[in-house]
């Protein structure tokens, strides 16, 4: 499978756009998740997608250094998370994928949605809707841990 190059996607669709400006809507196959993650969060489709709209949101709302870091590490955060939490109802997305990279925690929110196909079948699709560096030590304190990489089970 061809490896996704988010910096290239950024250059093609996002770079140089004005804040809040619309972008050409593209859905990008970001990566496939692992079987362990599929079982842990009970999803049926291993493919994880990202839209240019979500990427534009990150570009408009994150500091440049953080956005650049996310461009280069989003696949790793989603494909190999250290922990997965159930996202809060007040937050966008169903799951919070968390990974520690260079002594900082990063969170990517994954939303699972059902899409009607032209043949009438329904397909589950998974989208990254946002990502950011977790700045507050207690940010995840009230989130429910669903899975962690170390034990392949939630810790108590």
Predicted regions: what they are:
Residues 1-156:
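Ribonuclease/tRNase effector modules and their secretory precursors
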């Amino acid at each position: 499978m061809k490896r996704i190059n988010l910096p290239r996607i950024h250059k093609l669709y996002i770079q140089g756009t004005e804040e809040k400006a619309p972008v050409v809507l593209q859905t990008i196959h970001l990566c496939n998740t692992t079987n362990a993650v599929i079982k842990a969060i009970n999803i049926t489709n291993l493919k994880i997608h990202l839209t240019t709209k979500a990427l534009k949101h990150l570009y408009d709302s994150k500091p440049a250094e953080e956005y650049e870091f996310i461009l280069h590490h989003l696949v790793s955060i989603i494909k190999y998370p250290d922990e997965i939490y159930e996202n809060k109802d007040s937050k966008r997305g169903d799951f919070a994928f968390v990974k520690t990279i260079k002594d900082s925690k990063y969170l990517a929110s994954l939303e699972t949605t059902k899409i009607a196909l032209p043949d009438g079948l329904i397909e589950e699709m998974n989208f990254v809707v946002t990502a950011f560096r977790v700045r507050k030590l207690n940010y995840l304190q009230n989130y429910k841990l669903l899975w962690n990489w170390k034990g392949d089970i939630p810790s108590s």
